[in-house]
């Protein structure tokens, strides 16, 4: 096939006339030669034959045209020499150990205007252990393009990759052809008439021969009217025999049926025949008795169209019995019985929940460890089973049963027009994909290993956007947008007509340490390397396979310290790599090393070891990765970041002796796109499966390797992000995208034993010109899609990192935005996401396979699906961490918790020791298919959350600016037991384990020097019985410890320690505005003396200036008085408390943690007496310094009615029962309030308000005097018995009510704990129904019982895991 360029030239020659033709002929020939390098008249034909010892040197201006396949030792092209590959029908294969191009040498196959149309392969051969001296720069088995060298490889123009446009189902079902399925409501004999020439359904009809004999007559008429030669598929659904007369039975027998004559009641029956050819018939018939179990009659037959293409017709007539597991039942009082346990006893204990005759049984210990079970006796209703652990009968365990559902009919008719083949429907025109080409279809599930290869087949019937491929898919590959997220599988082309490949051995051999410990195949492939000063390099339409070596520097394509590769470097046209297929590689795909301005476009990288698209040392900038696809990226041995856990532990030669690997910290980072400098462009790229991460922006504090000194320290951490637009990441383990971490830029040493380039901590803060003293320049991430990533959709740490119009779905955690555990690294910056969508569990349920990590129930419909990590892993949309974070105009869809799986749209980082910024905020949040109970979750002790006792776990908080999350505009949401931010009017949200509060909040950082193992106790003076204990954020090995509580401003606090107070500490005022203050009393031993000063510390400039001193006063009131440069402290030696008033003196930017002048601090040096004891002054501080709890910022009014965006909502419930004393008078006060409507209690006893749990309306209210409670409690029993199920029941006491007696049993019926003991005051939120909601609450105290909380409406029981 000739190039289009040649056709154009020929056409011009034909159209020319006379002298003009003759005059232009030589010019046209010159154009051909320019565009098609093999047409140059200066070329000499060259056919060197096959000689492995022939060392070819093409120089001194020789210009050769390779016309046939050849085998040589090596080829060196230099000194103006040129080698061009002839483009003709013969497949040319050039085998050589290496090709070196330098000093004006050139190698050409095709050109940009005249693509190579034939087939040309370069095969690089040789082993690493052949005792051949490697080139000191290029090594072995290479194409090297050195100074002055030119490499031009231009293959056919073919589409590089596209997307599926229709979903592929496992086994190819529903792909092409015809699919028909029915159940109830489609009774009778179902007939399909199929055109045998085309394999298409011509007509179909249903004949209800159960209902009427006339339907039998119509069936006979219908069959008689079908022309001979047509295919008939006939089957019964449900029942078709009751009014089936002999005429119809005989008509079917005439067609070839042997069983229709004897069709009985509800018998499954399927039949396929060709009209007029009874011998072609296939038939299946089952006599079905009873209503339990499954039965199926299935037939299929293979046919051939007039075009010679095969199609398969199949039919099944079935009775199907679905099964499901019951919930788990606790069985802690197991009777000892020789004959086993009777299931009837369990059914009596759990009425309506266990079937009579289970199909299977499972048992576990109370901790979830599987136990053995055995059915020991079945006879009628006497069904028994036994449970064993280590050969002995179980004493206490959990058990569940597999029960069959009622049977249902099912009829299926399908025509598979692609027998052992599949039609792929694609987005783009794929006419350039030819029969014999190989494609790869990416996984759209969590496992990257669900990527599948297919070979293209001829297909006359395919449209321009379809191809037929051999075989059937094993996995589900999505080809559509699901729940608003584009999850279409990428489809990449792997084969090209120009191939560069390594010749490989059958198995691994050791050419470097440990290589055969990790790989059983040969990994010593070929490689292409471009050095500084090459003349030109343009590769397109090329396939690279079996390339790369597990040696540093030997990669499939490697630009090595080549400098600027675009116009800035004098390259015209600029260097590019495009339309390449790089697959089955042994070390990366493309490496950009110390090179800038390279265009990498339309490249497919598949099945590689180590990072695929790789930037190496840190100074690589202005490179553009446009429309590149990487998938199936596996770990390699080269760098710590390439290695998996096993490699990390075994390969320790590059570490210092004594190094103990920590794989998840030091290694485990292999990524599809590894960006060592943010100033590169990624546009329209897809990271479709890596063992770790899709896109990882990593930071080199200084350049590494041979690039040392190319920028100043910290440059890469401050350079603005290049374009990051319309990229996607899925099927990765750790994350779809990460911006975080750095690499260790020093060699291993006794001080730091980790290997060079291990993963370490780093922070990103983009500024103009990479100068932190210049304005910030946010990193903008637009139109990013992340789905089916097992851990994170994205983990982004900044600096200003802003996301806009992004999509996240089916990730373990959709998004974590982080700044710094102590301070934001770039104070004044924020992380932000807006106009984005988060989906918890989409309609992409994945494929249930043996190798699926996790398969379990979904949250909304409880149907099976693949899950990201574990069945009980708490799936989260956005995870709050550090701050400040702004979430604006985002939609959360399909987040639904199960009992045992705490899924939520908004949540917090698990096991968090670090700070939580009170200025983290949300606004204009929308929820779709998210129960209100699953909007937020603050955590509880248990799996994944552990004890929930780390400092950050206890101080989590965020600001709901418009009430779109909580229904309380302007409120703050906090953990329910964080009394440093609570006030008396806060409203509990039991489902969230949180509370809705109002107030003005900031943070106080307390740094205790020369002591890292102190436990701090901080108490807010208005809630002295609710201290907060903080362990400190830092490890015990540090020289100081830091505590970071969120506090309410304008309040008083005391601070205590579990050991002797620290002799030196600093208190930082964080997120304080000018004039904000708190009063603090710090516990010290008696006899302590103090030196206290204040200063301002500029963290950016690392400058500190003293601003004042504190002098002692003997009057507590003087602590309130302060003057510029002079403040007071009060040392109350009786209580052991040092009192200070901490007040911010300077203005603060909106998102800054510290003031514009720096961080305001108070430093305390204490001279402690010897042998001082524990510094806990709680007993002497309270009640002396207790303050009355008041609400400084009133609670916002709850949104109602049309203000709410969802049908489910919160019902505000307030109840109080208290005793108040005014001098010698006593007043009992009680009320119940529902959504602002108050029901006062008028007499001693109890008052009840009943609320419809479906709509939230009060349906009744009443009171029961003490006389009734004590004398005739049956009135209360009857009242409660008459309350409809699914009702919320509120109850409050007033006065001296009766606290004991039979009436209290109603509390237990409404969800209160058994054996409760009531005190003088009681408030109760109960529920009448078949389950106990988490929000059932009983408060009972001697003086005051109070409940302020919300209840979700409608009340819905969570499904069990």
Curated annotation (Swiss-Prot):
GO terms for cellular component: clathrin-coated endocytic vesicle; clathrin-coated pit; clathrin-coated vesicle membrane; cytoplasm; endoplasmic reticulum; extracellular region; fibrillar center; nuclear membrane. Keywords: Cell membrane, Coated pit, Cytoplasm, Endoplasmic reticulum, Glycoprotein, Glycosidase, Hyaluronic acid, Hydrolase, Lectin, Membrane, Nucleus, Repeat, Secreted, Signal. Glycans are attached at residues 119, 165, 312, 420, 889, 921. Residues 44-166 form the G8 domain. Pfam families: CEMIP_beta-hel, CEMIP_X, G8, ILEI, Mucin2_WxxW. InterPro entries: CEMIP/CEMIP2 (IPR052252), CEMIP_beta-hel_dom (IPR055401), CEMIP_X (IPR055400), G8_domain (IPR019316), ILEI/PANDER_dom (IPR039477), Pectin_lyase_fold/virulence (IPR011050), TMEM2_PANDER-like (IPR039473), WxxW_domain (IPR025155). Activity is up-regulated by histamine. It is found in: Nucleus; Cytoplasm; Endoplasmic reticulum; Cell membrane. Residues 1-30 form the signal peptide. PROSITE patterns: G8 (PS51484), GG_LECTIN (PS52031). Expressed in Deiters' cells and various supporting cells in the organ of Corti including inner phalangeal, border, inner and outer pillar cells (at protein level). Weakly expressed in brain and testis. In ear, it is specifically expressed in inner ear. Expressed in Deiters' cells in the organ of Corti at P0 (postnatal day zero) before the onset of hearing, but disappears by day P7. Also expressed in fibrocytes of the spiral ligament and the spiral limbus through to P21, when the cochlea matures. GO terms for molecular function: carbohydrate binding; clathrin heavy chain binding; ER retention sequence binding; hyaluronic acid binding; hyalurononglucosaminidase activity. Mediates depolymerization of hyaluronic acid (HA) via the cell membrane-associated clathrin-coated pit endocytic pathway. Binds to hyaluronic acid. Hydrolyzes high molecular weight hyaluronic acid to produce an intermediate-sized product, a process that may occur through rapid vesicle endocytosis and recycling without intracytoplasmic accumulation or digestion in lysosomes. Involved in hyaluronan catabolism in the dermis of the skin and arthritic synovium. Positively regulates epithelial-mesenchymal transition (EMT), and hence tumor cell growth, invasion and cancer dissemination. Interacts with EPHA2 and ITPR3. Interacts with HSPA5/BIP; the interaction induces calcium leakage from the endoplasmic reticulum and cell migration. Interacts with clathrin heavy chain/CLTC. The signal sequence is essential in mediating its proper translocation, hyaluronic acid (HA) degradation activity and secretion. This is Cell migration-inducing and hyaluronan-binding protein. It comes from Mus musculus (Mouse). The gene is Cemip.
